[in-house]
């Protein structure tokens, strides 16, 4: 399981790195941004329906619309390993934005659809 989580995180770093490198080549973003990425790998409960899973992942996008500090989200895992069959990423403007998200009304509302179908998850918060 540790290997699969590290593989997913490695892939996410490649994606973020490629995006950053492309932006820098064109005079865009900094090499080491101060944004925070909130990486969550997860396994759904066996009885979670496709509709419930879709609603939970769509909820990640809804959070981004409700909170100014969320700059981007990713909800479609292209490749996963081990028993963590899904992942999502939220990018926050800075560490304060991540702190503002924790315990927010938007998070609490989303938890109503997410937590009942989540079997387990692993979270990493990463910045420079």
Question: What residue ranges belong to the model's regions?
Answer:
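Low-complexity intrinsically disordered segments
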Residues: 1, 16-17
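Bacterial N-terminal signal peptides that target proteins for export
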Residues: 1-9
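C-terminal partner/receptor-binding element of secreted or periplasmic proteins
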Residues: 115-124, 128
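Short S/T/G/P-rich N-terminal loop/turn motif that feeds into the first structured element of a domain
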Residues: 7, 17-86, 93-100, 126-128
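Short, exposed beta-strand-loop hairpins at the edges of beta-sheets
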Residues: 99-102, 109-115
